[in-house]
Amino acid sequence: MRKRIKPAVLLVFFIGIISFLVLSRTIADLQARERQETTKTIPNPNTPRKTTTASSSSKKEEDINPELVGRPIIDISGWQLPSEIDYDVLSQNVGGVIVRVHSGAQAKKENAATYLNGLDKSFKTHIQEFQKRNIPVAVYAYVAAKDKKEMEKEAEEFYKAASPYKPTYYWLDVEEKTMKDMNAGVEAFRAKLQALGAKNIGIYIGTYFMEEHSISTDKFTALWIPTYGFDDGYYNAAPDTNTEYDLHQYTSQGQLNGFSHYLDLNQIAPTQDQEAIYRKLFKVQKDNSS
């Protein structure tokens, strides 16, 4: 006769089998997971490494404000009195400002806009007020010396007065013949300015004057051309020239909120990349290099 197995023994037996299966599955899962983690940590020799390099430009540059790119650019001097300007309002309507610092050696006596030494009476206020409102500022000097030595002296005075404000560009305003070889005089001014430390130097000149007096623009890094069309306060047409230029002064009769009198209005050449040229002329650098 067969011996009966007690139910309690069977229960213990089945519980043991089930526990063994569960434990085996758990161990297998853990081993598989460990193999996966090990595979992840082993670099694939065929996978290119990612390298992180610091951008040199990010150390020096601040990006431009894109809202400013399409706005008019104005050039002003002591003839635009600070007391008549609402800088808060005008700053909302311009993309950049070019401020006269030196009026040239033609000054015979002091006037409302200029000291006898040629320095503009309002340049400091204009620069400071616009810079406080985050409007980029460039500067210009009217070139009117009678020989190369005097040209270099004016360049020194211009740079000494303007450089503390770290302008984005230095412009030479060339409108009249004041010495026999005007091209040599302009180059003497430019070269002296560069030797003093100015890196961005442009020239403002009419195409007719440039051709008539053989003024070379090759060593300048930017060209600013005045042509007014009807001079009615609006942009009429691009300058009639094959010369590549950066900035166009298109009217002397412009009107903008923030100033109740006429202003010179300028725009970036329509044939150029607007943002690229704006960045070239008006980008402020973190290290404020001139």
Residue ranges and their predicted role:
Residues 1-14, 24-26:
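N-terminal Sec-pathway targeting helices
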Residues 20-41:
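Sec-dependent signal peptide cleavage junction
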Residues 42, 48-87, 221-290:
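Functionally critical loop-and-helix segments that line ligand-binding/catalytic clefts
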Residues 64, 68-138:
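N-terminal carbohydrate-binding/catalytic regions of secreted carbohydrate-active enzymes
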Residues 72-75, 95-100, 136-141, 168-173, ...:
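Structural recognition of the beta-strand scaffold that forms the well-ordered cores
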Residues 78-88, 113-129, 148-162, 208-212, ...:
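Alpha-helical scaffolding within the catalytic cores
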Residues 147-163, 177-192:
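Alpha-helical scaffold elements lining the catalytic groove of polysaccharide deacetylases
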Residues 169-238:
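Catalytic domains of cell-wall/extracellular-matrix polysaccharide-remodeling enzymes
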